């Protein structure tokens, strides 16, 4: 799909190109109380009051997400107009903008339009510039066009005909908007990879498959890839990681991807993704109902791979290392048992009270491994706890950090990227719940504050660098009729890295 930019100040009568330029459809916004947006006012004048008459007749009330096509419109180059309800003008925020953009794309994709002019990016949204609107609109479009059909005997072809979108932006934002297109396409490609990996079944997306995916990313984008096998993991003394992997016939992999966009001496940001490609719970077996969704337990790994792919396509001037410990968590005669004690790469001994709290067991060794890069920051991403879902639901990812500055950067990025996160507590008092009579610490701290104690466990392995943890158990995938991986938190992570790179 082709995206382009055209500067236009509707308030100064600069809309001639849009009024005469050929297009299948122009998208206009209408607020409640019959208020026309700037672009809609110009088109209304060119069409001799058509938009006003439609609104006055009650055919378009401006309620958020409502759409109305006006066919065969005379006086402008576009053959039709799509009116999109924006809701109340004084409540028009980022969510309202995304709702409007999504509604517009859904309506357009159901038609045979090929070229569209999109004016909504210029709407005032929480002090964001129109280049922000361009990026958000492209991501909304790519979200609507994403389909996962490759596992069907007859994959479904794309049902839409849309090929070209022209965005009108404020003239001062033209240069930034062109950058926004590049970033949005790269980000959408990274999200698609993340979603594909999450949606693949566990018998396809194995640890070996993730390793091969990392190698392909490295080959396609000029990254350096290291994929360590069982013997190398054993040599590193990753006893905690291996305690999870031991009962599966699928060999574990320890994946490291290096992206160098800055000077070699510049400290990298390290992203660590939990890669449990299927989680039965091990000996602490999960209930059978809904266990199919445990293929999504590698979405942390998928988001890290999707992010570094997006970063490489954007060409960000920053160094990034992606680390993915990946294995299955299976029951078996040689599986780790509740009460077993294992030794982590750091040397801390861990009493495994519940084998279904396995994500932290593979992450802790990866977090120790990250020390060798002398990182500027380390962010781990994991579908870690059901407790986080209970606390935050499916809207916000849980953010935990021992570093206020890093947490602030991530929260700013989450707001900019429309990928919400909520900071959770990480007080020292919670550490007491991890005490063990027999080892240095236990892998669970009981039911109270389960998401917090999981993060506390990880914090024991992160003392040498700024660290944050994203619990995406509630945001990595959706159930029900819209079942599937979401691609989150790739937008948050990518925006954080864009900000760090100053781009």
UniProtKB/Swiss-Prot annotation:
GO cellular component, one term: cytoplasm
Cofactor section: Mn(2+)
GO molecular function: manganese ion binding; metalloaminopeptidase activity
Chain sites annotated for binding Mn(2+) 2: 274, 279, 297, 358
Cross-referenced InterPro entries: Leucine_aapep/pepB, Macro_dom-like, Peptidase_M17_C, Peptidase_M17_leu_NH2_pept, Peptidase_M17_N
Gene Ontology biological process terms, A to Z: proteolysis
Entry-linked HAMAP family: Cytosol_peptidase_M17 (MF_00181)
Name of the protein described by the UniProt record: Probable cytosol aminopeptidase
Originating species: Burkholderia orbicola (strain MC0-3)
């Amino acid at each position: 799909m082709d995206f382009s930019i055209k500067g236009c100040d509707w308030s100064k009568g600069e809309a001639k190109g849009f009024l005469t330029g050929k297009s299948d459809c122009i998208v206009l916004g209408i607020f409640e109380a019959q208020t026309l947006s700037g672009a809609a006012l110009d088109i209304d004048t060119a069409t001799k009051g058509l938009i006003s008459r439609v609104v006055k007749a009650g055919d378009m009330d401006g309620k958020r997400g409502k759409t109305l096509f006006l066919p065969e419109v005379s006086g402008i180059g576009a053959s039709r107009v799509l009116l999109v309800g924006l809701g109340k003008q004084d409540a028009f925020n980022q969510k309202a903008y995304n709702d409007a953009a999504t509604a517009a794309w859904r309506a357009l994709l159901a038609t045979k339009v090929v070229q569209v002019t999109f004016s909504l990016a210029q709407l005032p949204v929480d002090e964001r510039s129109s280049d922000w609107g361009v990026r958000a609109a492209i991501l909304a479009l790519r979200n609507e066009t994403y389909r996962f059909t490759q596992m069907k005997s007859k994959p479904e072809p794309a049902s839409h005909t849309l090929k070209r979108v022209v965005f009108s932006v404020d003239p001062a934002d033209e240069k930034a908007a062109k950058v926004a297109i590049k970033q949005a396409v790269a980000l959408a490609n990274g999200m698609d990879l993340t979603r594909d990996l999450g949606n693949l079944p566990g018998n396809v997306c194995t640890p070996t498959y993730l390793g091969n995916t990392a190698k392909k990313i490295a080959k396609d984008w000029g990254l350096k890839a290291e994929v360590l096998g069982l013997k190398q993991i054993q040599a590193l003394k990753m006893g905690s990681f291996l305690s999870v992997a031991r009962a599966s016939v699928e060999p574990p992999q320890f994946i490291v991807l290096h992206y160098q966009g800055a000077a070699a001496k510049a400290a990298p940001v390290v992203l660590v993704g939990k890669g449990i490609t299927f989680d039965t719970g091990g000996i602490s077996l999960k209930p059978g109902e809904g266990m199919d969704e445990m293929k999504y337990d590698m979405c942390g790994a998928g988001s890290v791979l999707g992010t570094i792919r997006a970063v490489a396509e954007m060409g960000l001037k920053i160094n990034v290392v992606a680390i993915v410990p990946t294995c299955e968590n299976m029951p078996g005669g040689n599986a780790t048992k509740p009460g077993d004690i294992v030794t982590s790469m750091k040397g801390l001994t861990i009493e495994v009270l519940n084998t279904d709290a396995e994500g932290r067991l593979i992450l802790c060794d990866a977090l120790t491994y990250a020390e060798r890069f002398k990182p500027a920051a380390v962010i781990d991403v994991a579908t870690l706890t059901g407790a986080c879902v209970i606390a935050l639901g499916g809207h916000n990812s849980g953010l935990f950090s021992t570093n206020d500055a890093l947490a602030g950067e991530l929260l700013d990025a989450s707001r900019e990227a429309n990928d919400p996160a909520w900071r959770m507590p990480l007080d020292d008092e919670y550490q007491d719940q991890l005490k063990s009579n027999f080892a240095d610490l236990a892998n669970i701290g009981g039911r109270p504050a389960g998401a917090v104690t999981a993060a506390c466990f990880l914090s024991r392995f992160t003392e040498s660098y700024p660290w944050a943890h994203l619990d995406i158990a509630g945001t990595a995938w959706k159930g029900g009729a819209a079942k599937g991986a979401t691609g989150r938190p790739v937008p948050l992570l990518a925006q954080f890295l864009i900000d760090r790179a100053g781009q």
